[in-house]
């Protein structure tokens, strides 16, 4: 009350000589007659200081001007008046912003379009302004339908308090980009994990789980066919104990092998195939009539070699084929003469051309 009494005494004299101390150094010294507006401002300042605690009096005086400028720059009140059959000339849109710090969302209604030469454009409404108050009613937490009903019930005169929504609009754009980046990161992470699993399968040779290796096995089986050894049904049969059964198997092997000699296969695949056949062949030759079957097999092999020596055999095939019958005698041949003869065989080169055309 002492400050108010001092101000009243000085205002009654018509002059104000007030010099601020170090705490109020930002305020200039006022001299001369005061107007009614100045007296009103001084009275408001005195009332504000009198109601605040002592520790916050200086802080309130220091920030009073900045708060006033901030509120004036962020908030504005616009009055829009339209004709009876006319429109206000603006469109609104409601956004729901997700708060990252707390599990809540904020709803704000902002102007998305303003028509030129409309009452809203003439009143000063801009795109991006956010509704804070409509006809004295706060729109905080209102849905889009509630805001529309409030505007329609106002009649021809509409008083809107708006906020500058540039930062909020920018925040909404950044939130949308953040969600897009999160989804992209999730997809890339799944792709990275799948590539890592494929790499581990290829490095450790896990053919059961690797699709590439499964396709390779299927292609290999389709290419080589019967050359990979006896079928599982053949392995399930009882052991060969008679001469006729062993001869029939050898004859079928000779006929099938003559048809398949033209196929170009790798040396490792042939060796692996005949290594699986060796166990079955050994079981056949250790039967009760082993010596007689061995002589018949050697004579049949010599006849098949003499018949097909004109072009179906190759040195690699003969060496692998004779490895099945390890005890059979082999004829010595000159390698150089055979290589020259194989150059003129058309059937051998035709198989190679067919294999290249598949790829």
Curated annotation (Swiss-Prot):
InterPro entries: Intracell_Traff_Signaling_Reg (IPR052122), PDZ (IPR001478), PDZ_sf (IPR036034). The lineage of its organism: Eukaryota, Metazoa, Chordata, Craniata, Vertebrata. Pfam families: PDZ. Its main location: cytoplasm. This is Cytohesin-interacting protein. Gene3D superfamilies: 2.30.42.10. It is found in: Cytoplasm; Early endosome. Residues 165-188 form a coiled coil. Keywords: Coiled coil, Cytoplasm, Endosome. It comes from Rattus norvegicus (Rat). PROSITE patterns: PDZ. By its binding to cytohesin-1 (CYTH1), it modifies activation of ARFs by CYTH1 and its precise function may be to sequester CYTH1 in the cytoplasm. Residues 166-188 are annotated as: Interaction with CYTH1.
